[in-house]
Amino acid sequence: DRNLNQMRSVAVYYKEYSSIENLQLLGENYIKQMKRDLTPLTFQTSILCQRIGIAKDGFYSSMREGHKYNASDFEFLDEKFKSGEWSAESGEAFTCDADSDVNKDAPICIGMDYNANINWIVAGQPDGRRLNVIKSFYVKFERKIPEVVADFCTYYASHRNKTVVYYYDATALGSNYAVNEQDFRWVVVHEFERHGWTVEAVYLGNPMRHDEKYLLINQGFAGKQRLMPFFNRQNNDDLILAIQAAGVSRGRNGFRKDKGGEKLAESEED
């Protein structure tokens, strides 16, 4: 018993629980709100406590932990908290001033994904042979392209070079299911300009075939392309989850990224 008690004195009990098991304290409305606000994968990990690792046979199988990095400007954060400008109770959102990987004198490159239920902006800057994915944004349901652009502009309000290099392909032309009248490209450019940003629009043509995209991306992760992608861990947790969980499906035209999970209907009432 003495030996057992000695081991117990330095032991730590660790167990992971789903938030559903704490439903009585959290309340049903909290769970519903989290399901509405978070991406499906983030809801699975942060609320349901399900572990999602990098799929070894997935679409982005060459991604490794080394492709993630931390870039918090702790000197800036310490100064803000010590001065009382920021506090845990203030609820004030962080901005790009808290990021140490942003070159404020260089343009920000962006790519976007347009969907009826969720719209994304992924922002990056090249740094030598690195492509640093510095931040990603998403909006869901009634919040569409104007809102995700506004979120971007708010976060990067102190960025000195207010230029975005907007890469888009044919999917941004002639489609408007995420907006009212104009196509995606027009709305993106219009919204950035309305917020005082300059847009350098770069048309990429038709979308790449999935097998070509797979080869390009995984060669990039392996350092065999001009740029190797790296992800700011704190600013891309939802994006990293999506990348790690992306699978591969095979059909008559070869393999492709499995978008089965992306196609599942998700309503505001779910």
Q: Which residues fall in each region the model found?
A:
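Short boundary motifs at domain starts and secondary-structure transition points
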Residues: 4-6, 95-102, 155-158
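ATPase catalytic-site recognition across NTP-hydrolyzing enzymes
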Residues: 19-110
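Short, intrinsically disordered, charge-balanced linker/junction segments flanking boundaries
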Residues: 267-270
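A short acidic Gly-Thr/Ser loop motif
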Residues: 112-117
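Short beta-strand scaffold segments in enzyme catalytic cores
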Residues: 119-125
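Mg2+-dependent endonuclease catalytic cores in nucleic-acid-processing enzymes, primarily RNase H-like
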Residues: 130-263
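Signature of the SF2 helicase/ATPase Hel1-core->accessory helical subdomain module
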Residues: 1-21
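Hydrophobic/aromatic beta-strand patches that form the interior of the parallel beta-sheet core
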Residues: 13-16, 110, 167
